[in-house]
Structures are given as C-alpha cells and as structure tokens.
C-alpha cells in the first residue's frame, strides 16, 4: 500500500487492523480504527481466499465506522427512553433489556453455568452474533419475570435456563 497515493501506511510487524474501504479519504481505503466493527455477515471465503482486509479493502457495507456506531447507540437510547417513559406513564413493568444485555458482557452464572457474549462458546448468543440462543432467551425471560414479579408483586416462577438447548 505504500504506493497508493493518500494511503497512510501504519502497518507494523505482526497483527494489524483490517484494510477497509473509506470513500472519505483520498486513497479510498484505510486501516480500520480501534472500536470499529466488521459485521459477521462478511463472506468468510472473501476474507480467507480473496484477500479482503489485507490485499483488498473490505467493502464499506461490511464495516460499521465510529460515526455509524455512535448513531446506532443514540437511536437505541432514544427508543429505549421512549419505551421506558411510556411504561412509567401507564404504570407498566419496564424491563431494560439494553442494560440486561450489557450484564451478559460481564458474564452471568445460572445454576453453575456461566453465560457470556463469547462467540460460539459463551452460550448466550447464537452463531449470527446478534440473536440470543434458546438459553439466552431463557435468561432474558427470567429478567422479565423478575421485573414483573417486583412490579406487580406476583410470584411467577423462574425458568431453568440450563434445560434449554444451546450451541454446544
């Protein structure tokens, strides 16, 4: 890439960030930045065999840049705040699933089994990296049950998460 006009070569010996398309820079490509995300929908064969990310930049539609991530986070916060306000206004139980999913990042133990966001082996998220596994949905259901029980002073029993299928 040293011969590509406008490309700032920041490569070092060892691991480097992927090379991604970026129409906003002169060269039209750059190294990915810390905090940017490569989508799991990227064709794996293109990474392995077509040189995407190393000798060819990863197409923009497979990359979430820092601005896009900030926009997503802002929209998520706006939607969640609206939902919470409506629940409060109508005296309904409100489950903050965004906060709950953030607790999974730290790991949740249920009856001796730890669930985390670790891809494939964490047990909470499916192989698409977005949706929960049946066990992950059972964890979410338990969070809903806890909230309903607290708000309405009910006694709905918790689900045994470990009885549901996981990935492994």
Model-inferred region functions:
Residues 62, 89-95, 125-132:
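Short, exposed beta-strand "edge-strand" segments with a Pro/Gly-rich flavor and a Y/T-containing core
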Residues 96-99, 136:
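Active-site proximal loops enriched in glycine and acidic residues that flank catalytic Cys/His/Asp
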Residues 81-91, 95, 106, 142-153:
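Sec-exported extracytoplasmic/periplasmic mature domains
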Residues 1-89, 100-120:
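Acidic, Ser/Thr/Gly/Pro-rich low-complexity segments that form flexible
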Residues 118-167:
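Histidine-centered active-site loop/cap adjacent to the catalytic His
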């Amino acid at each position: 890439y040293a011969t590509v006009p406008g490309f700032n070569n920041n490569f070092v010996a060892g691991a480097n960030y992927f090379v991604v398309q970026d129409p906003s820079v002169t060269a039209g490509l750059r190294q990915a930045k810390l905090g940017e995300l490569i989508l799991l929908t990227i064709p794996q064969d293109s990474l392995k065999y077509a040189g995407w990310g190393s000798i060819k930049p990863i197409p923009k539609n497979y990359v979430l840049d820092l601005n896009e991530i900030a926009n997503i986070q802002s929209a998520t916060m706006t939607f969640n705040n609206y939902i919470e306000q409506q629940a409060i206004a109508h005296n309904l139980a409100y489950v903050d699933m965004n906060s709950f999913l953030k607790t999974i990042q730290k790991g949740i133990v249920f009856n001796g089994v730890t669930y985390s966001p670790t891809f494939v082996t964490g047990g909470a998220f499916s192989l698409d990296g977005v949706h929960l596994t049946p066990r992950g949905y059972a964890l979410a259901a338990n969070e809903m049950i806890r909230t309903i029980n607290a708000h309405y002073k009910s006694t709905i029993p918790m689900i045994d998460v470990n009885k549901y299928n996981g990935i492994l």
